[in-house]
Amino acid sequence: MGWWRETIDIVKENDPAARTTLEVLLTYPGVKALAAHRLSHFLWKHGFKLLARMHSQFWRFWTQIEIHPGAQIDSGVFIDHGSGLVIGETAIVETGVLLYHGVTLGGTGKDCGKRHPTVRKGALISAHAQVIGPVEIGENAKVGAAAVVVADVPSDVT
């Protein structure tokens, strides 16, 4: 129950509209998408890649949030609203990160290896921001709404 409690508490801390635990569980697509990703990622790491992709696609349909099963997402991440959010296969998202709707953590093409962003602890990426390629968003950095980021953002920068 630890992950669930932590996730619910993060939602309630960051969204004044989140009044009850039941409301968060039933109405927050980001919570559902992150929970589904935990299983998809487990399947992916253990070689069940097609099953992992099918599972993630099912939840993409229900939440409108696309998280590739290969993406590494720590506990303590908050996806607010979430609709249209995309997280690519080699992305890394650390604890305490806040992601809003329409955010893309995307790649730059068919390169092999690390091709998606790394978002460090406590960073905030606002609505419709596009973070493209193997760039790093530093700890506690803030990326503004509709920004297009193609280079590293240092820690504690807005």
Located regions from the model:
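Structural signal for interior beta-strand "rungs" in well-ordered beta-sheet cores
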Residues: 60-158
